[in-house]
């Protein structure tokens, strides 16, 4: 029977690529989303992947979402925490809600999701948790104190939970993408991309969502049990942690 994989933020951008790649690798995939019903319905129609809507910043919503996924598909063995938002501005202009929204969605969601799957994983003595952090959680970024703090927190969370899960067959790893060719990044002015961003990347190009997805498929595999507590930098050489 195929293992069940749940991807938060799994219907757009990097998350959509992850959902598609896991399905292609033979997993029974559930893709969480939190915003556009129309976009999620289109994704489901194109891929055949089941979609589930809930707010990952709410513990109760995550509990209900996990319960529904497991009732319909079976126990969740692979969790990919990919959902995230930005509310960029310099700290001296940042409103409290811009801080809390990013922290609660990007970092709080890891507790909300992991807490609701970890007991089942421990009972079954198997689990793969993969957290999508960011290069900006490693190096920081101007105008992103909230986002950088949350993404750095994801790395710390990963290392701590990896120690707790190691003896019961649960691996926990983080992936830190750099600039990836999502719709959001590709919408940037070409002049900004060509003059300000690409020169910082030694390989001279943006990453592709599918490249991150392939990393996830590897870390999710049954035979990837040696890898836990790791932070995989996928940034084309832009930053070395």
Residue ranges: model-predicted function:
Residues 11-12:
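Conserved glycine-rich cofactor-binding loop
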